[in-house]
């Protein structure tokens, strides 16, 4: 009906205005020019997910020798998961990333190196490591992932001053 179409258009206009407002209100950052392709407009949390009581099954630090077995079990029980990966540019890694994506699971960045002292030495070092992992995921799967998990957790003992700046920058990026 015309009423439903008008309502849908109004909702779309409101969403677009909200997105534009969010982008315009993002604080300027000294890191804004580094990897501008790593920006997302997705919310960090979802009330919708909380209301449904959804549980997320995640795997860190892969892909590994267990990836294909894990995928088989997940398929057997019709369960989807998220894999936070530490990828490399080997054919074996690319094949596992492709298998994860083809099975309908989510892939997120964990780290390219997983070497905390290097990753957390500066915001730029973190972004370099992050982008390397992000780029490998994209090259292997065509997916521009919008999710990540900090190596060592977002609260860790590695360079807390830099960690706080990294959290601020990654929050700014969406």
Language model: regions and residue ranges:
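Short flexible/disordered coil segments
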Residues: 149-151, 173-174
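Intrinsic disorder/low-complexity detector
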Residues: 12-20, 35, 39, 43, ...
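Non-catalytic interaction surface on structured domains
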Residues: 75-77, 160, 167
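Intrinsically disordered, low-complexity serine/threonine-rich repeat tracts
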Residues: 1-29
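Active-site beta->alpha N-cap acidic-glycine motif
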Residues: 27-150
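Active-site glycine- and acidic-residue-rich loops that bind
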Residues: 155-161
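His/Asp/Glu-enriched short active-site or ligand-binding loop at hydrolase and phosphoryl-transfer sites
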Residues: 163-174
């Amino acid at each position: 009906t015309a009423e439903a179409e008008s309502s849908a258009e109004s909702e779309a206009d409101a969403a677009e205005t909200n997105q534009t407002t969010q982008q315009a209100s993002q604080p300027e950052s000294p890191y804004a020019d580094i990897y501008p392709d790593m920006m997302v407009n997705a919310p960090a949390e979802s009330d919708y997910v909380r209301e449904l009581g959804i549980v997320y099954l995640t795997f860190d630090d892969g892909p590994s020798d267990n990836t294909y077995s894990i995928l088989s079990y997940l398929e057997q029980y019709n369960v989807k998961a998220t894999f936070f990966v530490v990828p490399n540019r080997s054919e074996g890694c690319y094949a596992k990333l492709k298998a994860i994506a083809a099975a309908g699971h989510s892939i997120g960045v964990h780290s390219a190196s997983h070497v905390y002292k290097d990753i957390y030495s500066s915001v730029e070092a973190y972004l370099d490591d992050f982008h390397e992992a992000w780029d490998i995921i994209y090259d292997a799967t065509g997916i521009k992932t919008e999710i990540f998990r900090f190596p060592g957790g977002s609260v860790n003992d590695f360079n807390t001053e830099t960690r706080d700046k990294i959290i601020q920058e990654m929050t700014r990026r969406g």
